[in-house]
């Protein structure tokens, strides 16, 4: 970490070129001149600030910008990520941002700043859910929320550098109750899962370690399980129905939720793998489901049809075990 901190501080051009390359790899149209201006504006204004990790503070907005690039957001959002802490930290004004980067980016930066100032009340999860709805309602531009989620994700990735345990726990709890559900609501399921996992490590470290050890044990005894079964599924399912088949290992937090919901002991947990089949149409999805159920028997209480009844955020799929 120290080596990276020194390198980032001494070679800002090197990291700008990395960001520029990442944007091009993701085929995002952008104003390179404005991007470079924002990058160095952030670097210069945060020059005297240091994060808990010992890194230059400007490495944080840089990391947030890269998260947004990987999500393929527009260049205005990426520039906003580079500038998102400047007003809040008092190193720039609205007028400066507006004059240098335009009205749209200034409004986005101002929106993220306002969102950062809203504090989660000391309430239970039920009320935290209402708070999530409140945040969604006040975000006039959904990009403001996505930038804030990326900001929280990077802060969670570096949470272990915070020495004060009570502060660390508060951030993790807030992430689990508010920001992870928000990520799910706007369709970023991978981000939601990572936020949950990072928060769970802090809010219940003992439970996390126990479950993670179980996952490692099952992983050790199921070498190449995912790749073998992806190949198996490809051989079973007709290719003209399917666009993509992938597999993944479930995370500790989702396993923990299942244990609580179904009152299952840790030793009984065996299904730590999930497979996703993306089809060309809804009709193809049901055809593939029929093929799968012909090969393997369905567990009745584990079937969910989110095509006929989509989730509130528009999510549509079929889940089966």
Question: Model regions: which residues?
Answer:
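Short, mixed-charge amphipathic alpha-helical segments
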Residues: 22-38, 94-104
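Aromatic/histidine-rich interaction motifs
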Residues: 114
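Hydrophobic or amphipathic alpha-helical targeting/insertion segments
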Residues: 84-89, 93-111, 164, 188
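Nucleic-acid processing machinery
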Residues: 1-29, 43-51, 58-71, 79, ...
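Active-site alpha-helix of zinc metalloproteases
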Residues: 76, 80, 84
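Short, solvent-exposed alpha-helical surface patches in well-structured domains
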Residues: 34-37, 108, 170, 287
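Hydrophobic packing positions in regular secondary-structure scaffolds
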Residues: 76-77, 99, 106-110, 120, ...
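Generic alpha-helical structural context detector
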Residues: 40, 66, 107-110
């Amino acid at each position: 970490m120290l080596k990276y901190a020194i390198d980032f501080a001494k070679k800002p051009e090197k990291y700008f070129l990395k960001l520029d390359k990442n944007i091009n790899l993701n085929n995002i149209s952008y104003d390179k001149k404005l991007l470079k201006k924002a990058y160095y504006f952030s670097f210069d204004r945060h020059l005297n600030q240091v994060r808990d990790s010992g890194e230059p503070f400007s490495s944080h907005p840089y990391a947030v910008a890269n998260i947004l690039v990987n999500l393929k957001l527009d260049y205005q959002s990426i520039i906003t990520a580079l500038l998102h802490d400047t007003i809040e930290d008092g190193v720039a004004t609205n007028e400066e941002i507006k004059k240098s980067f335009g009205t749209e980016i200034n409004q986005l930066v101002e929106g993220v700043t306002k969102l950062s100032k809203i504090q989660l009340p000391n309430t239970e999860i039920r009320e935290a859910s209402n708070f999530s709805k409140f945040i969604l309602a006040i975000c006039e531009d959904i990009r403001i929320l996505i930038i804030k989620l990326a900001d929280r994700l990077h802060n969670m990735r570096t949470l272990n550098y915070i020495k004060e345990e009570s502060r660390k726990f508060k951030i993790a709890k807030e992430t689990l109750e508010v920001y992870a559900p928000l990520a799910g609501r706007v369709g970023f399921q991978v981000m939601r899962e990572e936020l949950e996992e990072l928060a769970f490590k802090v809010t219940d470290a003992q439970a996390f370690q126990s479950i993670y050890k179980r996952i490692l044990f099952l992983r050790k005894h199921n070498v190449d399980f995912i790749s073998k079964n992806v190949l198996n599924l490809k051989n079973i399912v007709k290719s003209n129905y399917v666009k993509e088949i992938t597999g993944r290992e479930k995370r500790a937090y989702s396993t923990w939720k299942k244990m609580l919901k179904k009152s299952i002991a840790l030793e009984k947990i065996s299904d730590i793998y999930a497979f996703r089949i993306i089809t060309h149409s809804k009709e193809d999805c049901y055809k593939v489901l029929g093929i799968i159920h012909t090969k393997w028997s369905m567990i009745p209480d584990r079937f969910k049809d989110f095509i006929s009844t989509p989730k509130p955020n528009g999510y549509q799929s079929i889940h089966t075990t």
